[in-house]
Amino acid sequence: PYEALRERADEVRAREKGEHVFVRGLIEFSNRCERNCRYCGLRSANPSLKRYRLDEAQIVEAAERAVAFGVDTLVLQSGEVHDEPQRIAHVVDALRTRFPVAVTLSVGEQPTASYALWKEAGASRFLLKHETADASLYAALHPGYTLAQRVDALQRLRRAGYEIGSGFIVGVPGQRPE
């Protein structure tokens, strides 16, 4: 049964996506974060983390190297901050203007207006993990936030027209098999 499933999955993959292997290049442009998620090294309460934020020239330089290596998608990632929507839009626009690649954002939950601004600037995809479907575990992992808020953010991203990447953390303490 496994071999038949694998063969069928390969047929569907070839029909839907073709033979090209998409290569994504991740640029972590900042490790600043306003949240204090219990599992994350970027959490705001981590006193040993030296914070940084790349400027636009550094991001473009990293993107240039990534594209030269054959990257199809640039993933711009940071912790969650809400003080720079215009800056992110400007960087997305600069990358889309300069390079023939897709731009994916991974910058946490944001206001709907920011999602729209970045979409207009040229971002086409957004990564926003929900980590668990258990509301009480989500609240324990993300102090001050709820699973309903995360689901709402995912729905707002969908309405804004993004392709969305999401998912779980497998093996997080407190997780149950169901």
Model feature map: region roles:
Residues 3-10, 60, 89, 151:
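Generic alpha-helical structural signal
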Residues 1-22:
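An N-cap/entry alpha-helix motif that binds or orients negatively charged groups
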Residues 175-178:
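Short, intrinsically disordered, charge-balanced linker/junction segments flanking boundaries
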Residues 17-58:
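Canonical Radical SAM [4Fe-4S] cluster-binding loop centered on the CxxxCxxC motif
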Residues 25, 31-33, 141-145, 173:
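Solvent-exposed, flexible loop/coil residues
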Residues 3-4, 31-35, 115-116:
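Short, solvent-exposed polar/charged micro-motifs at secondary-structure junctions
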Residues 44-61, 65-87, 94-154, 160-170:
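Core AdoMet radical
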